[in-house]
Amino acid sequence: MKYLSIFASALLATASAYGQSGESCRTASDPTLQKPELYAGYDCVNLLDSTAVTVQPTGSGSFTVCKIVKVMNTRGAVANRILKYDYDPLTAHAEFHRVTIYKANGDVINLDITQQQDYAAPARAIYWGARQIMMEIGRLDPGDIIDYQINKKGFTYALLTGGIGNDESRFIPPMRGQFYDIVPFWTTEPTVRKVYKVNIPMEKEMQFQFYQGECTSSMRYEDGRKAYTFVSTDIMPTRREPNMVDLFDAAPKLMMSSTPRWQDKSL
């Protein structure tokens, strides 16, 4: 009970700390304790997988990536002892904002994020110049919960011709003022709640389509801006089949664009 009380209080504090992320950085109670049979055999469970984006008039976005992962067994402990996140330095910059470990015995550990590493991402055959950030967590035990936030700025999905700039201009998309994203809604581990929220200037329009599945969506006005929120709950891992096409063509995904037509993004 001590562990549950500490974790619940910490989640409330975390939700408040996220500020602009609001709804997208809240999570429900831990269902692995309520329905253990549903998650038996899985190495870890994502209690929350959330991304909140604030889009600037230029089309550049500020991303808040929140994830809360519960370790279920020793395999999950080994798999999560190091956190990694990939990004493209041509279009974005990413860094760990905070990492907190809620131990099964009730201890709470806040890691020193100044110890994070940023290095060239491992690659073979073709080297695109991608980078990776990493935080070493160390020893974990079954029942431990990892709660972390990554802040990223920039954009995704564009064909570029120039090199890496040294100023903020590299975070502005080639189609200046336009925002575009493809968001996978499939998972490799059970996920209790997945949220994608994008906040855009009032004068911008946004079209979206959810493929190979369904989610709950809403659009609200917040502080003179439009906020689109997409939520999916109780997601189980997508099963692959022999000779199956890529999951982008078979599993649930969200596509968003501020351009009047999808085709405009391909020009």
Residue ranges with predicted function:
Residues 20-266:
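Beta-strand-rich, non-transmembrane domain signature
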Residues 1-25:
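Bacterial Sec-dependent N-terminal signal peptides
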